Amino acid sequence: MTLNGVYHIAKIGDIIYSLPAVYLRGGTKYYKIKREGVCEYLKPLLEAQPYIGRVEYSSNGNDCELDFSNYQALYKLYLRGNLTYMHLVCAGIRAHHFPLKISKLSLESEHLSYGNVEIDLNTHRDTLIWSDEKPWLTNIEPKHVADIIINITDRYHDWKNLGSKEHDFRSFDYTLCKDYDCGFIGLDNEYQLFVDRYKFEPKFIRVSDALETAQIIKGSKLFVGNASSAKAIAEGMKHPTLMEISKTYPDCIPMHKHGYHFISKELVEHY
């Protein structure tokens, strides 16, 4: 049965990772998003999905049947590895192959709590399982701009500020892409940081919304990047992906047969 509303308080990528749970719960008549800018960016992409009605900005989800505010509780409890599965748990769907790992809580019963948020694990719908190979972003026309689309943010790269002696990304070498037709999607400052760090200049691509981002990624042969909204879109389409992950916080591990959490010349050439 179609949900009477879904509400989310988080950022672009988190909302994209929530969509399999929305799909398995029967879709929704409307999806409300707390952040206005995030809402406007995502609206064309989300409304293109057959299981989502309208998308709108709202400061609260009081009238929504499914509220993902408790998603933050799972994140803080260190249920890490895949954000899609974390949303499935929030929606009362047991992710059978999600390793439920809790490092900051002694789980005495099938019940989680964090602050004023409570999640009853007994409500899981065991018959609902999401296939790792099933795309949840569809109805997207490919738009070819470059063979390889790159998007990285400075997320986890501020290692000096975090008191770390080592940068746990050093083994991921973006320069392996430099001899190919590459485009970079992202903010101006992200592009400049990339150029300064890796010493080559892919074409800079500006986009108007998430739907255009999806079209450009789908029109490419390969997506290369880190934990970002563009990576979430690539994951939602099950597009070939080489992903730079944090060994400390591996939140967005690719979960399909064309997703890799390392880069090599052989993989770049293969795609």
Language-model regions, residue ranges each:
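Catalytic machinery of carbohydrate-active enzymes
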Residues: 1-271
